[in-house]
């Protein structure tokens, strides 16, 4: 599971990728692995523990313990949304400061109530110097951001343009009047950027 510390590899929510990422963080930075597990336990009611073990073949096995059942269960038995959340938490705890963290549709399969928390976690990573780039189609995730945190990328024949949603006086006026960014986006008002 261990490899020399470098920029984090791609982390997926599939069981093998998740076990590999967890094992890498557990072996290289056990204190950060513990923080990722604590963050997962905080967001998944009833989750008592997560254990990572490296076998003789070098592969990691993840075992989860429910607070209401003494029997540990395997990562394959974990709900897909919980696996995705754990993948994001592992990545956020592994990525070194001043890195680029690119996430495509991080909202997929996550409980909608977790989207504001995900936004807060990504914001915290950004404040620590990590550049965070998200591609999303989730108004609920956009609602957890400020207009100044939202960049709109447009591609046309001449290239790619980047515009901050907060630079639009019209959007800012609506936002300051109480409209949520996700609702503005869903209404097509970002198209003018």
Where are these regions (language model features)?
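Phosphate-coordinating catalytic segments in nucleotide- and nucleic-acid-processing enzymes
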Residues: 1-96, 183-184, 188-190
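Walker B catalytic acidic pair
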Residues: 104-105
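C-terminal lobe/lid and adjacent interdomain/linker elements of RecA-like ASCE P-loop ATPase modules
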Residues: 116-193
């Amino acid at each position: 599971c261990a490899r020399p510390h470098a920029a984090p590899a791609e982390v997926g929510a599939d069981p093998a990728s998740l076990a590999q990422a967890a094992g890498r963080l557990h072996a290289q930075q056990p204190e950060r692995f513990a923080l990722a597990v604590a963050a997962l336990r905080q967001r998944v009611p009833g989750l008592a523990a997560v254990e990572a073990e490296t076998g003789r073949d070098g592969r990691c096995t993840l075992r989860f313990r429910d607070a209401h059942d003494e029997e540990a269960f395997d990562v394959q038995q974990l709900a897909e949304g919980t696996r995705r959340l754990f993948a994001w938490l592992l990545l956020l705890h592994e990525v070194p400061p001043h890195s680029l963290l690119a996430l495509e549709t991080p909202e997929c399969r996550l409980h909608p109530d977790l989207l504001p928390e995900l936004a807060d976690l990504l914001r915290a990573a950004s404040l620590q110097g990590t550049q965070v780039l998200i591609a999303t189609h989730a108004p609920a995730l956009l609602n957890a951001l400020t207009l100044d945190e939202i960049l709109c990328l447009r591609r046309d024949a001449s290239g790619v343009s980047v515009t901050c949603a907060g630079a639009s006086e019209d959007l800012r006026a609506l936002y300051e009047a109480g409209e949520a960014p996700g609702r503005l986006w869903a209404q097509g008002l970002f198209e003018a950027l």
